[in-house]
Amino acid sequence: MASYEIFITFGIYLVFLMAIGVYFYSKTTTHESYVLGDRGVGYWVTAMSAQASDMSGWLLLGLPGAVYTSGLTEIWVVIGLALGTYLNWKFVAPALRVQTEKYNSLTVPSFISQKLNDKKGYIRTFSAIVILFFFTIYSASGLVASGKLFDSLLGIDYKWGVLIGGGTIIVYTFLGGYLATCWTDFFQGCLMFFAIIVVPVAAYYSGGGIDGISTAMEAKDISLNIFKYTKVWSLPIIISGLGWGLGYFGQPHIIVRFMSIDSADELWKSRLIAMIWVFISLLGAIAVGITGIGVFTDISQMGGDAEKVFIFLIHKLFNPWMAGILFAAILSAIMSTISSQLLVSSNTLTEDFYKHIVKREKTHKEMIWVGRLCVIVIFIIASVLAMNPSSKVLELVSYAWAGFGGVFSPVILFTLYKKDLHWKTVLVSMIIATITVITWKTSGLSNTLYEMVPAFVINSISIYLLEKFKVFGNNEK
């Protein structure tokens, strides 16, 4: 059972997040403000909220655990994510900000549909279905992580942990909408950044410095040479790892941040901040795993679970008050991603379904409350999926990333930069990519090559060939 200091720290943290939602409740007066913050978010908040909603619990739990177990075998994923982050900010962010405002688009599906002149809304509908499916699963996986965190840290029953963590998210997302989500992500991103620096520094000295850590690594036969285990047949592993970066261009909960910044001219500042955050955070996560080897020479000291190395280092090295703050950073990593996914899903239901199904004129107040109700509905569905602590839903996180990356990434790039792209070309290519992701995963081929890579390639080739040979003719404007 955790000490009262940790309970108090967690309580203050959760109340603080809900207070942000209450604060922005009165500032959310229009549908666009609830969905996109009236496109008035500053560059600091844009950068930090995008990165906080991106990394999730993998940054503080998954990556350090992988490094603790097998050294730098995950380095290709890290490199892929860093490159993908930069390219996303460099090539997608400015164009998406300008063009979504031009077409008055509040969601990714509506932008693609409007720019390509899809008058029937087929692309919008198909895109919305894909987003709702994968984000409901994605959100459920975050709630599973939340429940397990409350259970392992505070001794709170798993199901109550799901409801407490999710309930807090619901309060500030329901009340404050997009602005509340961005600002909570901003503070959570700062807390994550603080933790990822402080913990490995303390662990370095506790583990005996370079000599102590090196000795422990040699005893476990772990090397920092990224090519030690790289053979000719490792090429698919390298491609799969680097391929994670391709997914960034199509992640709705990340690229929506580009759409809401107050000026496209400020995006270079956001890019600089984001890249510094990502670079240091990824290095810090790797350092947690490496220094953890020096502190815990045997995995049994952590209950046999390498992914808890960050948690056990905090328990061992810090007093309860500081531990509570650092544990809150782990919860931040989980909550920042869930809130963004819930809001994007809600906006998809509201903007891409309700708005077009209900033909009569709708007020801003009505659209805001429909959005709030959608947040609750999606949360309930995700919570039901997450109620089983042994749920396999966590395994679907990479599946969801592949779904968005394979289906949306090429489409976003072509839509932004290809002139006279036919909407039928895009719709057919999206369907082909979706089938590719599902088939590749269910056939077991993903054990050899990450399913997003073939989906991305096939999607891109499909768009190129269909347009080159004008299969659907010229797009009507």
Question: Could you tell me what each predicted segment is?
Answer:
Residues 1-477:
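Membrane-embedded helix-loop-helix hairpins and adjacent transmembrane boundary segments
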